Amino acid sequence: MKRIVLLPFALLTASCLAQNPTVSREVEGVYADAHALYVDLHQNPELSFHETQTAAKLAQRLRGLGYEVTEHVGGTGVVAVLKNGDGPTIMLRTELDALPVEEKTGLAYASKAHAQDPPGHDVAVMHACGHDVHIASLVGTAAIMAHTKNTWHGTLMLIGQPGEEAITGAKKMIDDGLFTRFPKPQYGIALHVMNRLPAGKVGVTEGVYNSNSDALRITLFGKGGHGSMPNTTVDPVVMAARTILSLQTIVSREVKPGEMAVVTVGSVQAGTRPNIIPDQAELGLSLRSYKPEIRQQLLAAVTRITKAEALAAGAPKEPLIEHVGGVEFVYNDPPLAQRLRGPLEAALGKDNVVTQPPITASEDFSNFIAQGIPSFYFTLGGADPDKYAAAMAAGEALPSNHSPFFAPDAEPALRTAMAAEVAVLRNLLGGPPQ
């Protein structure tokens, strides 16, 4: 499925980086190693908080570049610090973890990895969210910054964060002393590769970048029995089905039109055999919103509707509604985003830096921001430009993050990521050592 078309690719690379030949040469100098690391990581993904080999590979490479590296921060987290005279401390973060997804990209280096998920099930594992691109680009950026210390001053702090997909990894690192054992940064930087832009472009968003997220586990209680005698039972499967349908009215009938709100029931678990009515059913929900008041409205509505459906079904007791995870939206400091747009345009070309609206996905980088660290989180284009153009013309969507078919166009995406990160860091780290 992977295609390498040499002429368009070469033209794209030249277009992306032609605005700054120096950055282009620096990126080419580290590209081969970065791409080799990307392929290795893609073939060997690891689930949240089990990223032992991923973390070790990152730590080894950063040590080799002269960074002071600390492992096992917040579990499998990595912190690498490079001091270069007086000046600000700037943090650049990558995630380490992959997802329990069976890869179907057809790539020559597709993952065949398996692991045990938290409940103990054997699952396929894939870098279906692009964290392998993020790690490889961070290492390439780290190499450029280490080799060109005459172009900046201050302290560069690199973070390899575990458990982003569990939206708890950032908090674990903070709780383990991330900003007390190590320098607290003046600014934080991160990116995310997505197919919402073609490879070679980056997206800039001022203010709210993504959504609040809440994960709920709902247990509905019934009365089990024989499948041939449903009248002697209180069927939690039917209760679950009615609850799922009723929950769909929250967005369509309760939230003000125009407000972003998502209520997704992503998992349903009940029963063991066709002729056994179980005594309980479990739902897994994901809620998304931009505004705090909408977030609270969604949570309250889910609770009200779930309890009402259980009461209507004659449930023997109230449902158990557990808030198993949540995170606030990532907020891009507007003055910082405005400041960094210029260096990005200089490095990539003005046409390759676009303004983007907030996205509906979520992530826990917001926990770093909540520690009083103004930040800039931007989108890295990942789509093959030809496929992107064809999809836009046809009104179709390319495979998104978390899809088993998600396969960023790695070559131009990696080059663009490194050029962008270097440009941003040099701007914030202010020129030659003082």
Can you annotate each of these PLM segments?
Residues 19-127, 132-153:
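Acidic/His- and Gly-rich active-site-bordering loop/insert found
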Residues 41, 62, 80, 92, ...:
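Divalent metal-coordination and catalytic microenvironments
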Residues 114-126, 132-133, 145-267, 272-278:
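Histidine/acidic-residue-rich, glycine-tolerant segments that coordinate divalent metal ions
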Residues 103-114, 207-211, 388-399:
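Short, flexible, mixed-charge acidic loops at enzyme active sites
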Residues 5-15:
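Bacterial N-terminal signal peptides
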Residues 238-434:
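Metal-dependent amide/peptide-bond hydrolase catalytic core
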Residues 22, 29, 33-36, 40, ...:
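Extracytoplasmic/secreted proteins, especially bacterial periplasmic and envelope-associated proteins
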